Amino acid sequence: TSDYSSRNITRTDRDQPGYDVNGNVSYTRSLSKRSRLSFEYRINYTDNSVERNTFVLTKENVFPDERNPRQSTEYDYAYLTHRIGSTYQYYFKKTKIAGTLHYQHAAFSSDYAFPYARKTETSFDNLTYSVVANINVNRNNTLKFNASGRTSNPRATDLQDIVNTTNRQNVFAGNPGLDPVYTHRLSGQYIRANPAKGRTFTVSAEATASPNTITDSLVIDSPDFVIDDEGTKLGEGNQYPKPVNLAGLWSLRASVNYGMPVRWLRSNLNFRAGI
């Protein structure tokens, strides 16, 4: 086996061309004087090429023409995303309600050419939603609700089924088995206003939940840890992160706010408490 902890003087050349193409089409139809329905389709294609060549200074103090295979890399990757859905909107006086539902299909492909050939393909199918309501109970009282579910797909570098040794002190590996991050959010707000006296009272609450997030599994202080199929060791002082899904991220926030005018200050005074 070889030890990856040796230190050398290097020169690195990097080239990363890419392009992004997207388009969308939508159609909206009124269902009544108070409601309407719209349909939407979006497509996005992202293509990138990465070439990083590292040359190690020889004993003769010259950089060779041949790149170092352990610190050089060459690959292409692409993301193709289709998104289709509809939105329903309802209006009555000062009350507004809107609901959106989308289906999204994202296909990822990567061709790793150097230092070894490796192809990675995966896809994600997700449903995202959004519901927004703004209800005027009367002149002084308003209720607001918001519920949404959104996804964030893994990055291209996180999905590649390779061990990247271009950074000598931070060797990292991809994980093609990653799942998207799905975040659900629910919030509500009650507002009581007294326009005559300029006073407002607000109660707000918000809950967020992500059943699975993406974080790094980190190997440190393990110089004998084998990082690839060739038996290369991590080496002294280096670290080895790898992205993984981690379950259970929850948060809850709430606050109360009271505002009133202060004439002698010619300004408003606000009191706020929250958790």
Task: Report the location of each language-model feature.
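Primarily recognizes Gram-negative and organellar outer-membrane beta-barrels
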Residues: 1-275
